[in-house]
Regions:
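Interfacial loop-to-helix junctions that mark the boundaries of transmembrane helices
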Residues: 1-4, 24-30, 53-67, 178-187, ...
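Membrane-core helix-loop-helix motifs of multi-pass transport proteins
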Residues: 138-228, 232-238, 362, 383-416
């Protein structure tokens, strides 16, 4: 590893140190991430030719473009759902059953787990955070709820072919079928969620809150709400056309926006038509900037070969079909995904390991890469998005309350996989 690679690692570590302690230093994590990512690419570019940089930069910007537009579309749809009182409707109807805070905690966790498997972990997290805002008044309860949402979303996404980027990569690479990841991955993934869920439940405090009355959700609103949720389904279906999910998001968002403008200007909700135009302005751009900075930094490490070195160190130079080495490697990679982007690490492993490896080992990689990111809040797209959406949930707060439960869930998931397939 040359001096420039070492310098990149140092900048990356220092950047994350300041991100972790943003409240202590008073500097927003989004600006730190942007500065870190841009600085690392300047170091990478020093001494390189434009021809050599063209393809890596093009690939990095394509990844960032996809995520930014997906996030902008998803956040707009979520804002629209809130605008039409969907989350308030959920609150009122749940409160009618006089469900305790802890029972509600389990119900929402279960919904998040399976919603993530159907949609994806990022979308599910954004939607559930908005629902939780209406259901938990106390900051402590809401933070615990968001922590559990991140863990449940990542666990649910790990057992679905479309729930997480890494499972999509492994599925499209032919490492397992859609049914195999669901059937053989669901039990370890459930364990990765249930153990932290059980631990975090004890931290939920009692809240004496009754559901507030709200406006009835009119038929027109229900139609738009259903159309909004359908947009997330379209984002999954466009994969059949070999298109990235953001195509489905912007397609569905365009249709919903057109219908809103047409129907609201002719119906009873005419007075609210102007508010719809402003929904995009309500998007938390700081969260998106944070994503951009983190992705730039990780792509710089990838271009410099740092991630390949890490993957090679984990598995060795010449990996053969050695179960012990593969299990150890996949488990270690999952732990590293708490700090580094699991996508390039997974991509390196796919290319590195020989063909013919039994699919159950790839199931393990899907589970570890998907759930290992829950150990730190910066380890997954769901965590980073939640960190941007919930200012009170800092890196330190998550580390103090969520990291150990998530780690125990991770260990439990790996142990469950081992008991299922190795004994």
């Amino acid at each position: 590893m040359d001096s420039s690679s070492i310098l990149l690692i140092i900048i990356f570590a220092v950047g994350f140190f300041y991100i972790a302690l943003e409240h202590k230093f008073g500097i927003n994590k989004s600006w730190i991430a942007l500065f870190m990512g841009a600085t690392m690419w300047m170091i990478v570019a020093y001494g390189e030719t434009s021809h050599h940089l063209h393809d890596p930069l093009k690939h990095a910007f394509a990844d960032i473009f996809e995520l930014v537009f997906f996030l902008m579309g998803a956040m707009t749809i979520v804002e629209m759902l809130g605008h039409f009182r969907f989350f308030t409707w959920v609150e009122v109807n749940l409160m009618k059953f006089n469900i305790s805070n802890r029972m509600l905690f389990w119900i929402l966790g279960l919904i998040t787990f399976f919603a993530s498997a159907i949609l994806d972990n990022l979308t599910s997290t954004l939607v559930m955070i908005h629902i939780g805002r209406y259901l938990y008044i106390k900051k402590e309860n809401f933070n615990i709820f968001v922590i559990n949402t991140i863990i449940a979303a990542n666990a649910g996404g790990a057992m679905s072919p479309v729930g997480d980027v890494t499972t999509i990569m492994l599925w499209l690479a032919g490492k397992f079928t859609a049914w195999q990841i669901v059937i053989y991955g669901i039990v370890p993934s459930l364990v990765a969620w249930i153990i932290p869920q059980a631990i975090l439940t004890s931290q939920i405090k009692y809240e004496d809150r009754e559901g507030q009355m709200t406006d009835k959700v009119l038929p027109t609103q229900w139609g738009l709400i259903i159309a909004g949720f359908a947009t997330f389904g379209i984002a999954v279906l466009v994969n059949l056309l070999h298109l990235p999910p953001f195509f489905g998001i912007i397609f569905g968002m365009g249709i919903v926006a057109i219908v809103i403008d047409y129907r609201l200007k002719k119906g009873k909700l005419k007075k609210k038509a102007g508010d719809i135009v402003n929904l995009v302005k309500q998007i938390d751009m700081a969260t998106i900037f944070f994503f951009v900075g983190i992705l730039l930094a990780v792509d710089a490490l990838k271009f410099a070969g740092v991630l390949d070195v890490i993957a090679t160190t984990i598995f060795g130079d010449n990996v053969v079909n050695d179960p012990k080495a593969i299990i150890t490697g996949h488990t270690t990679l999952g732990l590293l995904s708490a700090l580094l982007d699991n996508v390039p690490l997974t991509a390196a492993v796919i290319k590195m390991l020989p063909d013919g490896i039994n699919f159950i080992y790839w199931i393990l990689l899907a589970v570890t890469a998907g759930t290992g990111g829950s150990i730190l809040i910066i380890g997954s797209a769901a965590g980073v998005a939640a960190m941007g959406q919930v200012p009170t949930l800092t890196f330190k707060e998550y580390l103090r309350k969520g990291s150990m439960p998530a780690l125990l869930g991770y260990i439990g998931a790996v142990g469950t996989w081992y008991l299922m397939f190795m004994l």
